[in-house]
Amino acid sequence: MAIRKMKPITNGTRHMSRLVNDELDKVRPEKSLTVPLKSAYGRDNYGHRTCRDRQKGHKRLYRIIDFKRNKLDVPARVATIEYDPNRSANIALLFYVDGEKRYILAPKGLKKGDIVSAGSKAEIKPGNALKLKDMPVGVQIHNIELQRGKGGQLVRSAGTAARLVAKEGTYCHVELPSGELRLIHGECMATVGEVGNSEHNLVNIGKAGRARHMGKRPHVRGAVMNPVDHPHGGGEGKNSVGRKSPLTPWGKPALGIKTRGRKTSDKFIVRRRNEK
C-alpha cells in the first residue's frame, strides 16, 4: 500500500493525497453481514444538536465485524480483503469450513487465501485469535477484550498494536499504543499482529468538500466569533482570550480541565499513559 500525491491541477488537489489500495478486492460487501446505518450526524434522540462539527456525510452500510472471535478450533480461509467506510482499518471476509461467513479486522500481512483460526491450538501468526494466557510474552496483539466474552474493545484502529509484556497469576500486563500499562485477565481473547492499513493517518484530505463527504463540518475558533456567540469573541484584531482560562461556548472551563471520571476499572491501570 502506498500514498499517491495528486497533481496540482486545481487548488483542491494541490496538497491532496490518496491511499493506493492495490491489495483490496473491489467487490460488494457480503449482504448477510451488512445492515443499514442511520447516521446521527451530531444529534441526540430529540434531534437537538450535541456536536457542532458533524454532519451526515455519504450514506454507508454497516459491516458486522466479529470482535468476539468465539468460533473456536474451526479454520477459515480469507476470501477477500475489503474497504470499510466505518473505520480506519480494512476488513477481511472469512469463509469457515462449515459454511459460515464472518468479517474480522484485517491485520498487517494477512493476504487473500490465508488460513486463520481461533482457540488455544491456533499458532502465533497474524489473524489468529487466542486467550492472553496462551500467548508468548512479547507478541504484538490487537482487538483485545476487557471482559471475557464481551468482544474486543481495545486497539482496533489502523496501524495500532499492543504488546504482551508479562504474566502475573490470572492477569497479564499489556502495554497499549498510548504507553499505558494495564492488567487484563488471561481468559480474555486477543488477535495476533498489528492492525493493517498503517499509512491511513498520512493521507492529506486536501479540500473541504472531501471532509464534508466524510461527515465533518468546519470547526470555527471562538476568537473569530462575535461576543454574543462565544466567550472568546469580540475585540479589535487578534485579541487574547481575555479571561482567567479558556472557556467553552457555554462558559465552562476548557483546555487543561480534567473531564475523565473515575471508573472501577482504574485499579487495573499499572502505569498511566502520561507517566514514564
UniProtKB/Swiss-Prot annotation:
<dbReference type="Pfam" id="PF00181">
    <property type="entry name" value="Ribosomal_L2"/>
</dbReference>
<comment type="subunit">
    <text>Part of the 50S ribosomal subunit. Forms a bridge to the 30S subunit in the 70S ribosome.</text>
</comment>
<dbReference type="InterPro" id="IPR022671">
    <property type="entry name" value="Ribosomal_uL2_CS"/>
</dbReference>
<dbReference type="InterPro" id="IPR005880">
    <property type="entry name" value="Ribosomal_uL2_bac/org-type"/>
</dbReference>
<dbReference type="GO" id="GO:0003735">
    <property type="term" value="F:structural constituent of ribosome"/>
</dbReference>
<dbReference type="Pfam" id="PF03947">
    <property type="entry name" value="Ribosomal_L2_C"/>
</dbReference>
<feature type="compositionally biased region" description="Basic and acidic residues">
    <location>
        <begin position="263"/>
        <end position="276"/>
    </location>
</feature>
<dbReference type="InterPro" id="IPR014726">
    <property type="entry name" value="Ribosomal_uL2_dom3"/>
</dbReference>
<dbReference type="GO" id="GO:0019843">
    <property type="term" value="F:rRNA binding"/>
</dbReference>
<keyword id="KW-0694">RNA-binding</keyword>
<keyword id="KW-0687">Ribonucleoprotein</keyword>
<dbReference type="InterPro" id="IPR014722">
    <property type="entry name" value="Rib_uL2_dom2"/>
</dbReference>
<dbReference type="GO" id="GO:0015934">
    <property type="term" value="C:large ribosomal subunit"/>
</dbReference>
<protein>
    <recommendedName>
        <fullName>Large ribosomal subunit protein uL2</fullName>
    </recommendedName>
</protein>
<dbReference type="InterPro" id="IPR022666">
    <property type="entry name" value="Ribosomal_uL2_RNA-bd_dom"/>
</dbReference>
<dbReference type="GO" id="GO:0003723">
    <property type="term" value="F:RNA binding"/>
</dbReference>
<dbReference type="GO" id="GO:0016740">
    <property type="term" value="F:transferase activity"/>
</dbReference>
<dbReference type="GO" id="GO:0002181">
    <property type="term" value="P:cytoplasmic translation"/>
</dbReference>
<feature type="region of interest" description="Disordered">
    <location>
        <begin position="223"/>
        <end position="276"/>
    </location>
</feature>
<dbReference type="InterPro" id="IPR022669">
    <property type="entry name" value="Ribosomal_uL2_C"/>
</dbReference>
<comment type="function">
    <text>One of the primary rRNA binding proteins. Required for association of the 30S and 50S subunits to form the 70S ribosome, for tRNA binding and peptide bond formation. It has been suggested to have peptidyltransferase activity; this is somewhat controversial. Makes several contacts with the 16S rRNA in the 70S ribosome.</text>
</comment>
<comment type="similarity">
    <text>Belongs to the universal ribosomal protein uL2 family.</text>
</comment>
<dbReference type="InterPro" id="IPR002171">
    <property type="entry name" value="Ribosomal_uL2"/>
</dbReference>
<keyword id="KW-0689">Ribosomal protein</keyword>
<dbReference type="InterPro" id="IPR008991">
    <property type="entry name" value="Translation_prot_SH3-like_sf"/>
</dbReference>
<keyword id="KW-0699">rRNA-binding</keyword>
<dbReference type="InterPro" id="IPR012340">
    <property type="entry name" value="NA-bd_OB-fold"/>
</dbReference>
